[in-house]
Amino acid sequence: MNKWISAWVKNNYANAKRDLCTCFINRGFNLSNDHGYISMITASSWMFISSFEEFRKSLLRRSSITSMIQQSTHGYAGVTVPTTMFVLAEGAQGVTGTYIRLEDFDRPQWQEPRALEALADPDCGWLYCRAALDFADIPGAPIAYWLPAGSGKAFLERRCADIFQSAGRTKTHNNEVYLRKWWEISTAKLGAKWRRYCNGGGFSKWAGLDYDVVNWSTEAIAEYGSHGGLPNMDLCDKSGLCWGLITSSKTSFRVKPANYLYSSGSPTLIASNPEETISAMAFLNSSLCEAYLDALNPTLNTTVNDVLALPCPDTDAGVLASARQCINLVEDDWDSFEASSSFRRHPLL
């Protein structure tokens, strides 16, 4: 949008100003008759992204989604934009809508056959029936129709924010100077000038990816602090959980050992009870949590606020024991290779 249109939209469609397509949806409400229907094809970004939260809430108050087909990024030949086609019933509340999800069929020639297949066979696996009011229970009200029916109620119970605190982050502002791999540093200097450092990385559930160390000398700490780059000093030495901020696949949660520091690329949460951390990690590494995160923020970044908004089941002794076993197994596997500082020999030797 140019400046003139941007200013006009801001004045006339305040809660839809982020995109012209949402402005057109709002305009559709103005043009429709009472209890009329509005049908459009738009980009699908408004369904999930946080900047459209107020727009979604307004839409759900004013209407129900009676049907929707969410197409893949390459749903049309020559177009690389995820789109959605939908019908809104203006003034209706509590209507159960029919949703078809074609995201996994990322070819133009697959869109129509898979949509027709879903209509012929509701048990195909990509057709869902959901009431629009269910979305209001999920933080941010995303149009997450693929979640199990009633799963939004879980967000009304205990959340991760009830047991975890954000531990901040370390920002060196010059990683080339202040970061090293652990094998580049004398072991005599580890724990004094150099501290172990969680720094994001690839996919690894439960444990691992602890390659890095950070300069933690008095001079380095002063430098980080001068740029606002120090973590929560009351929490940073405690054990917790962390994950990689940026991921192109699934988010993986793992242990942040006590006395390990962490970067902004490895968001970290601390609970007052270490058992709560281990138990929560079992849920966070589950397929259900993956579906929740996909609903809350279907982008490449998984932020602290995304995780704090997740539901958190009560601690269960059986789950706790299984989670500890998973951690031990992954740690043993990690220590079987030279990248681990606890490596002794390859298991095949």
Protein language model features and the residues they cover:
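Amphipathic alpha-helical
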Residues: 197, 201-224
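Ligand-binding pocket scaffold of soluble enzyme catalytic domains
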Residues: 230
